[in-house]
Amino acid sequence: MLKLVLPKGSLEKSTFELFDAADLSVVRSSSVDYKASVDDPRIDEVRILRPQEIPVYVSEGLFDLGITGRDWIEETSSDVVSLGELKYSKATSQPVRVVVAVANDSAAQSVADLKEGVRVTSEYPEMTRRYFAERGVKADIRLSYGASEAKIPDIADC
């Protein structure tokens, strides 16, 4: 019996359509219900959770299979096997781009120009921490829940 975890949010509708096309309709009592079912004897449990959490839960063995973004697999450093890219993912339609951006009036032209202790805001703090560490830059990494660019230069340097 398989335990599945499917993404809530931007990948939700397309994931449900993918399952529908495979004659495995995902059914839940309301759009805010986190438990669902699929009428198939091979599938025992279906949960709908944030994509950020899915790789961790799959790597811990709480679920057998999950659908999430590659960005969250990398961010969480989860030990999972990626079986492929889905045609509706942002990797294929609107890729996530992680960039280092500074204020227009900044003297920095490259990461090497950033001063020790630079304040960096990111939706991917672990990937960002690794990126700066690999380049020998000591940075104060802060989690951002979106609109990271709006935090420069007052709340963060980049």
PLM segments and residue spans:
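Domain-level signature for soluble enzymes in the chorismate/prephenate branch of the shikimate pathway
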Residues: 1-158
